Amino acid sequence: LGALLMASGLGYDSAEGRAIAAAVAAIMTGTAYATSAEMAKLMGAFPGYAKNRDAMLRVMRNHRRAAQGAGSDYEKLAIHPVALDVANCPDSALIEAARRIWDRAIELGEKHGFRNAQVSVIAPTGTIGLVMDCDTTGIEPDFALVKFKKLAGGGYFKIINQTVPLALKTLGYKDET
């Protein structure tokens, strides 16, 4: 995510950056729940789903409303979530994808239930992604454009963020080599 925002020339804490992050999170979570519903069709819903069906579907509908950018009309929520900021998302395809996948997740979930009660977690950053050619490893911005990874056998491995040249070009900087 950090590399995507950098390559797009968007500030991590800009309205546009937050909107892209929210759209990506909505797509990932909606896809995971749609897949969970497909699994429930084949393997059955999670234990306890029948008892919690109404509450689970209400949660899913509220997730869909947030993914659609709804400011109100949430079901049985005292505090409304921060909805996807549709107006500030510079990529309308992400918005449309989020809307479609949440519609699909609800449709499938109403028919088959869900195999999983929870489908996503955002883990802390790790360094494995850096040696797999990922310029950023988590949801936060890159902590350094040049990093040194200590090797178990001794020595260091230099890792350079390869997104910087694209980000500078996107922001209008000229290559003066």
Model feature map: region roles:
Residues G2-T177:
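Long, C-terminal-biased catalytic regions of enzyme "large/alpha" subunits
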